[in-house]
């Protein structure tokens, strides 16, 4: 379905500067293309953290994803453009309307949460402002898409689309979502890179935090054909990712930083493929 080669990213956040630098350097050594960071007041700010990451290793960096309601559109566009400039184009700007936890956080920063439509318009305004700031240098855009309106926006504006469904969504439904995206994108379809995030990879038992992340007990999640898991030997995992590329079109695979080493053999097996 897709002629794109695979690339791999690591999603995490720093607890200390030394630990963050070690993670970034290790990701680069293992062949990952990108270090990504989520956004939220419970975490360090992603923008200086990613600037630090880009300074310690020759690797791409990205927000995964910036919560639009936590900043004004002008502020977010300014931060994103600054990273594009400082990294010499190695920054990928992921932005979304914010997870439910961000509603209380907007109160803490003195900004309105807004309706779903207002938050979506905030994303659009941010992208428009970033385009003006970038000039001839264009920052790649990542958008998450699950519902019809988000899918339409992603089809029109995104370079990378992360298919935003929960851990229990059937494989057939995700494939249908990807097909709908390609239809909406029309002539842009081949220019859009499909991303898929993994909670876990390899053979280690799932940790307790996977219930918080997925809403499903680890044992139950293991019994499902969840696309947020990639289990088995390195060759089995590589074969499964090639099946996902063929049936869904996903070629940009991101993994939780806790599984950086577990996915590394797969990164090596699929290098250049």
Annotate the PLM regions:
Residues 1-273:
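Active-site-adjacent structural elements that line small-molecule/cofactor binding pockets in enzymes
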């Amino acid at each position: 379905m897709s002629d794109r080669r695979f690339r791999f990213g690591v999603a995490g956040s720093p607890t200390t500067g030394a630990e963050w630098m070690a993670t970034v350097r290790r990701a680069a050594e293992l062949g990952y293309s990108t270090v990504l960071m989520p956004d939220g007041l419970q975490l360090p700010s992603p923008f200086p953290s990613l600037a630090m990451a880009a300074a310690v290793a020759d690797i791409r960096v990205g927000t995964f994803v910036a919560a639009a309601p936590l900043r004004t559109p002008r502020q977010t566009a300014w931060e994103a453009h600054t990273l594009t400039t400082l990294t010499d184009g190695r920054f990928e700007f992921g932005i979304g309307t914010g997870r439910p936890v961000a509603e209380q956080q907007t109160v803490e920063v003195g900004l309105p949460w807004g309706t779903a439509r207002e938050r979506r318009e905030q994303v659009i305004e941010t992208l428009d402002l970033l385009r003006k700031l970038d000039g001839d240098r264009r920052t790649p855009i990542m958008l998450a898409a699950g519902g019809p309106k988000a899918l339409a926006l992603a089809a029109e504006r995104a370079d990378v689309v992360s298919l935003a469904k929960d851990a229990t969504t059937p494989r057939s439904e995700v494939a249908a979502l990807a097909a709908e995206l390609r239809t909406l994108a029309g002539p842009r379809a081949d220019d859009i890179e499909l991303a898929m995030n993994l909670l876990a990879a390899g053979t280690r038992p799932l940790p307790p935090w996977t219930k918080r992340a997925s809403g499903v007990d680890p044992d139950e999640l293991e019994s499902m054909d969840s696309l947020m898991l990639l289990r088995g030997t390195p060759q089995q995992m590589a074969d499964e990712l090639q099946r996902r590329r063929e049936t869904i079109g996903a070629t940009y695979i991101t993994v939780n930083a806790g599984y950086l080493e577990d996915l590394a053999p797969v990164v090596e097996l699929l290098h250049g493929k």
